[in-house]
Amino acid sequence: RQFENPANPAYHRQTTGPEILGDFAGRRLDFFVSGWGTGGTLTGAGEMIRLARPEVRIVATEPAGAALLSGAEFKPHKIQGWTPDFVPRVLNRSVPHEIVTVTDDESIAASRALASKEGIFCGISSGGNFAAALKVAEKAPEGSVILTVLADTAERYLSTVLFEGIAEGSDQEP
């Protein structure tokens, strides 16, 4: 019932949004990039950022194959936790200034890169957020400060495509 419960975005208005604003008080922030599943983070944190820092561009990101906010039809995708086959009632469509889509492969590759290069063990939706943030960075003015959320751990994905073809160290033969 998170999709319909006004407490969902309210929680992010009271916690995530103020935490971001506090962390960036007196500091530059140009973009906030967030995927959407239940709509809580994008709506709640996004509303607070827009209210307090109207110069910050809010960017929604969604699967390229299920880009409902972009007007596309839903198609199954592999970014678990993102974009059900409907737009949640609590999602405020007026929050994002723009929408960036990412593919399943981009999301998985970004998640794997975060693990191998940065030691951040995150899930596919976090990879999607990071992949979208990289797309924003490609077009943003030099020196822009871009914030995204890495909201899930890769432990939830051990039996999914995220780890497909990755052998355990103990499985490798000499």
Which ranges hold each PLM region?
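Phosphate-binding loop/pocket of nucleotide- and phosphate-handling active sites
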Residues: 131-174
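Short beta-strand segments
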Residues: 1-3, 35-37, 60-62, 147-151
